[in-house]
Amino acid sequence: YKEEVIGKDSLDVEVIWETLYNKARPFGQQGIAMNALSGIDIALWDLNGKQLKQPISRLIGGRFREKLAAYATGFYRLDGKKYPETSVEDALKFKEEGFTAMKLKVGFTPEKDIEYIRSIRKAVGPDVRLMVDFNACYSQAVARRIILELVPENIYFYEEILTPEDMEGYKALRNLTASYMAAGEEIFGKIEINNWLKNGALDIYQPDVSSAGGITECKKM
């Protein structure tokens, strides 16, 4: 990519993106080639914003809103800590700080995950919105069981409960529950996400700007 970027005008960000994308075609439109392209694209937008003394949000067309709702996340497992006790303490601290939504990290075993989520729900009460990130670790059969057992906990969305290859599984789970199905960190580019959209596989799409093609591509997704 170096020779296609060094010495070029950073304002030609769309031209540079297309040039790099076409050059990467033999290596596929996913994985490390797209990761590298994404990083270059983000850097170009950052440079343009600094040179023009404007936020990138304005450069890509402007802001529809000035505020966004925030949720607390984290809840990572640390050696030497007891769980779910440590996470219950963290959740209560977040609630005291004013957070009304939290996203939990799970994906250990179905039994541990169910117990963990129930413990957090019991601690924070029914008015806190809970989302759960499974890091793409379960089969459709196991995910179905988890979702059905957690119906009373009123989970707002299930994130990456299946592997990114299992589009049909996501479609089935989406029709199983009133909770939203979320994924997308491993969906690369507008062409791939269009397949998911056409199949109605998800409720919430979460492309990762650092791997899905950068700001230029994510704006089109």
Positions of predicted regions on the chain:
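N-terminal small/glycine-rich loop or linker at the start of catalytic domains
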Residues: 57-79, 116, 123-127, 175
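Catalytic domains of carbohydrate-active enzymes, especially glycoside hydrolases
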Residues: 90-105
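Active-site mouth loops of central-metabolism enzymes
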Residues: 66-88, 106, 133-140, 182
